[in-house]
Amino acid sequence: MDPLPEMMVVAAATGAQRVELYTEPYARAFATANESTMVERYAAAARSAQAAGLGVNAGHDLNRDNLPLFLAAVPGVAEVSIGHALIADALEWGLAATVRDYLRVMGDAA
């Protein structure tokens, strides 16, 4: 879902138990002048989702560089979907080392 706080209540009304925040806009804004504005949008959406009783997931274009800030700033993210970046990194560093590094990055951000 796009980071629109008002839509979290709508998602909850459908009977959903979780939402996945679509993070490509965050990834594009990462390390730019728009970064803090975008991070706050996601944080507000996550707070709204939690207030509506929803769990929060996130995914799309997350990677080892932009993931720590996202997890530190956006409350309650229970799960992230990182397919492309993880596999691309694994081709260079190996799957086991890459998974360990992502777990370290996520642990550092928690």
What feature does the model see in each segment?
Residues 26-27, 47-49, 84-87, 107-110:
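Short, surface-exposed, polar/charged, turn-prone segments marking secondary-structure boundaries
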Residues 31, 35, 89-110:
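C-terminal helical cap(s) of enzyme catalytic domains, especially alpha/beta-barrels
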Residues 35-58, 74, 102-108:
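Alpha-helix-loop-beta-strand connector modules within alpha/beta enzyme cores
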Residues 37-41, 58-62, 72, 79, ...:
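Short amphipathic alpha-helical interaction segments
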